[in-house]
């Protein structure tokens, strides 16, 4: 059965694929978006696919290595500037966050519901694993990451518990960490609250984002995408939590809206918009949520590159 990504139809409509265009799928995953783009491309079209995850790249090579329209590169979309010349792309797609295969395979170490090694790296060959990071850093740094990237209100208590636990035995397994966090939450007044999410959800999110430099890569990748898009080209981004969506929303706004001016100062027209927001933020409808509950938090935003005069070519 072919994998259908979250907000697939809306993403394809947002990209507005042209037959001979050149496109980037910066987060290949299982290839659902890439297949959608290729179905609309003619023989003269081109598709660059990227992913941090070597397993995703291996899947891309199995599926598309014989297609002359496809170029496959292993790496973060933050490296886009090294691969695409300025104004060379007609569309860029980023489908952010962790992919279903990463969550569903315990050995990848992303899931608090399935026991596996505490890894969380999208590229297992790059940087520290979550276990290595938690074993090395201070209580304060752990708390800061849980608060900043996980928006976890109990970040200090959880960090304190992690440091106390690791003094006696190493934290090496996902369920080991999840149970420790759950025990901390049960000892607080928040433990009695009924929540739809697991008590370790926010902490796992925060650690994962930090280990993979997700928000740093997003900021760099958005700027690179803007530079690489031709006038009239489309930027389509699907985010899955408020931190990602805030960065995307602010990026589009910063490049599309005239900043406020001081009425007491002489008016000098220096701002030239580079993007035009296309419609409002899009969320999954009830029909999609019935098929894919993971789509509940997804938000899709679309923007269009303008020319230097502020008009679409």
Curated annotation (Swiss-Prot):
Record keyword S-adenosyl-L-methionine present: yes
SUPFAM superfamilies: Putative methyltransferase TM0872, insert domain, S-adenosyl-L-methionine-dependent methyltransferases
Protein function: Specifically methylates the N4 position of cytidine in position 1402 (C1402) of 16S rRNA.
NCBIfam families for this protein: 16S rRNA (cytosine(1402)-N(4))-methyltransferase RsmH
Organism: Xylella fastidiosa (strain Temecula1 / ATCC 700964)
A Pfam family of this chain: Methyltransf_5
Gene Ontology, cellular component aspect: cytoplasm
Protein encoded by which gene: rsmH
Enzyme class, broadest EC rank: transferase
Stated name of the protein: Ribosomal RNA small subunit methyltransferase H
Entry binding sites for S-adenosyl-L-methionine: 31-33, 51, 77, 95, 102
